[in-house]
Amino acid sequence: PQTDGRYIGYCPEGWSYYKLSCFKYFPEPRSWDEAESRCQEVKKGAHLAWVEDAHEAATLRRTISYYQRVQPVWIGLQKSKESQAWQWTSGKDYSATREMPGNGARGGSCAALTHHSGFSVWSSADCSRQHHYICKFYP
């Protein structure tokens, strides 16, 4: 297995890395919009975490579980007001990303990972709800 040594300076202190991205868990309750703004304040180029493959989804799960196992966590997925399609904060449409299953049927236009699925399936939720969140950026 690859050691972490060569990546030590890759992400800022307190941030985890996966492939080429860095992400960080914030255990402070915020609405989805506040959380997204906070990500951008904390680090230039950061957004609520978007998911590009199944391994990255697993890394998010592990990160969340390390901190807690009961609270929902906002991720960077939101239903577009114009198209009504789910869209990642990276700008990509969700349908193109089959790596993380989700359920948009619960009402609400923002996506949270919940402990019911072991943080592996997103559920739609009211964007004004206050949840913990996870930010991501490419250094």
Where in this protein do the model-derived segments appear?
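Extracellular, disulfide-bonded carbohydrate-recognition/adhesion ectodomains
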Residues: P1-P139
